[in-house]
Amino acid sequence: MLAQAPRAVEAIALPAPSPWGSLVIDTGRCTMCLACVGACPEAALADNPDKPQLRFTEKNCVQCGLCAGTCPEQAITLQPRLWLADGGKARKQMRVLNEAEPYRCIRCNAPFGTLRAIETMVGRLAGHAMFQGKAAERLKMCGDCRVIDIHTDPDEVKVTDL
């Protein structure tokens, strides 16, 4: 049918709700927490195990909106459309919607999370009584170093029998 069209069309906008479409990520808001990846029932969204990336395969997206509803930063907008680029083959290709600089543990230098996610978390918890001093610094450590730091700190509060 595409071959018979009088002119090539890259995409056809569709009304919502539609079973086809893309996502628009506000990269200024997205912290790359990847909550959307876990929420996607069709595996349209995926992470990259090698580096902080949010990847998307449009043919898998059913525009259910679970990703947008799960996003704590409200950085996802559904874009109902039928993408016809490259004869419709582009819809089947995984593409990167967002990527970020990895954050490195302040103790062992291992990458974990993203710079933006850690900065956002530290900022949100800055006024919380449980995240002051050494506890605030632990937010900048990977999970392993956080546990080691708590158990090797002589000043850490210990649970004892009363």
Region spans (language model):
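C-terminal accessory/interaction regions of large nucleic acid-associated machines
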Residues: 139, 157-162
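Ferredoxin-type iron-sulfur electron-transfer modules and their immediate structural context
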Residues: 1-53, 60, 70, 74-126, ...
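Catalytic cores of glycan-processing enzymes that make or break glycosidic bonds
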Residues: 129-131
